[in-house]
């Protein structure tokens, strides 16, 4: 393997340490403790694991945290009432609705009901629109984390060709916008794209589609930076990303492992977003 591994766990630990230091200062100087409320509907096993990870991180950095766990049969109207109560609670600075939601509940309606200033996922239409317009806003956690990883390895996107594989509202679209804001020339790939051709020209490649080893190592441009957001379980139980890791690592300059690459950064940047929401909500200037 020629590529250097990008250690997402180590970078995430640094982000959490930065957040904790700021939380300690807020408590000492202003009596302000950031509060994060997580809403998990039903018994989806993966959601339970993700929420537990978020609660653990929140405790580590010194937040107050609450998990609201309504039954899967809750009506959309009743869930909206839960959101409205959290919106009105001054102790809650960040609200996260864990996806997926049951089929009878429209996630767009629920996400849009969260106050934009308490939307720490960065999914509210107002925050998504502000990102599009280049305004200061809460950023979607996963692409925000990817940008921090690029910063950590000294990769300046300016003037580089960045290819984002996947166009979801959660990762692909905001990822492309964040790279564009840093003056990369950005291409978004989807099911109708000539994927190999686009990947072969990428200086920075971000793959987020949820398809095991879709991107072949032989396609990677020598010296490229490869960020693999995917996490897929193969029939033998092995976790792999969306990129053929071993072959890609022979050609890339930097590459994220799966697991241990992007995943830890998503939770770390959620902590960052929650702290920033608390600062804005409490009208206290951030010191960075």
Swiss-Prot record:
Its EC number is 1.5.1.5, 3.5.4.9. Transmembrane segments: none annotated. Pathway: One-carbon metabolism; tetrahydrofolate interconversion. NADP(+) binds at residues 166-168, 191. NCBIfam families: PRK10792.1, PRK14186.1. One of its GO terms (biological process) is methionine biosynthetic process. Coiled coil: none annotated. The keyword Cell inner membrane does not apply. It holds the Pfam family THF_DHG_CYH_C. Catalyzes the oxidation of 5,10-methylenetetrahydrofolate to 5,10-methenyltetrahydrofolate and then the hydrolysis of 5,10-methenyltetrahydrofolate to 10-formyltetrahydrofolate. Homodimer. One of its GO terms (cellular component) is cytosol. PROSITE patterns: THF_DHG_CYH_2 (PS00767). This is Bifunctional protein FolD 2. HAMAP family: THF_DHG_CYH (MF_01576). Belongs to the tetrahydrofolate dehydrogenase/cyclohydrolase family. It catalyses: (6R)-5,10-methylene-5,6,7,8-tetrahydrofolate + NADP(+) = (6R)-5,10-methenyltetrahydrofolate + NADPH; (6R)-5,10-methenyltetrahydrofolate + H2O = (6R)-10-formyltetrahydrofolate + H(+). InterPro entries: Aminoacid_DH-like_N_sf, NAD(P)-bd_dom_sf, THF_DH/CycHdrlase, THF_DH/CycHdrlase_cat_dom, THF_DH/CycHdrlase_CS, THF_DH/CycHdrlase_NAD-bd_dom. One of its GO terms (molecular function) is methenyltetrahydrofolate cyclohydrolase activity. SUPFAM superfamilies: Aminoacid dehydrogenase-like, N-terminal domain (SSF53223), NAD(P)-binding Rossmann-fold domains (SSF51735).
């Amino acid at each position: 393997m020629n590529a250097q591994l990008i250690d997402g766990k180590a970078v995430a630990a640094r982000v959490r340490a930065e957040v904790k230091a700021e939380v300690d200062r807020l408590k000492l100087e202003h009596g302000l403790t950031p509060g994060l409320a997580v809403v998990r509907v039903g018994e989806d096993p993966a959601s339970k694991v993700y929420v537990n990870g978020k609660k653990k991180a929140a405790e580590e950095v010194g937040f107050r945290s609450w998990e609201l766990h309504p039954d899967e049969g809750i009506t959309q109207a009743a869930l909206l009432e839960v959101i409205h109560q959290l919106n009105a609670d001054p102790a809650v600075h960040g609200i996260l609705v864990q996806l997926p939601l049951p089929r009878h509940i429209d996630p767009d309606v629920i996400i849009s009901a969260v106050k934009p200033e308490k939307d720490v996922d960065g999914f509210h239409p107002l925050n998504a629109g502000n990102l599009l317009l280049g305004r200061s806003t809460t950023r979607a956690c996963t692409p925000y984390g990817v940008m921090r990883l690029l910063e950590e390895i000294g990769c300046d996107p300016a003037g580089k060709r960045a290819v984002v594989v996947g166009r979801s509202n959660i990762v692909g679209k905001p990822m492309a916008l964040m790279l564009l804001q840093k003056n990369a020339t950005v291409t978004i790939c989807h099911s109708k794209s000539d994927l190999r051709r686009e990947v072969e020209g990428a200086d920075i490649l971000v793959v987020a589609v949820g398809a095991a080893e879709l991107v072949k190592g032989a396609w990677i441009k020598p010296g490229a930076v490869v960020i693999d957001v995917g996490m897929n379980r193969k029939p033998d139980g092995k976790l792999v990303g969306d990129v053929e890791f071993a072959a890609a690592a022979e050609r890339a300059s930097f590459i994220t492992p799966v697991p241990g690459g992007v995943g830890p950064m998503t939770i770390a940047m959620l902590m960052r977003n929650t702290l920033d929401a608390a600062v804005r909500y409490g009208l206290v200037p951030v010191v960075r």
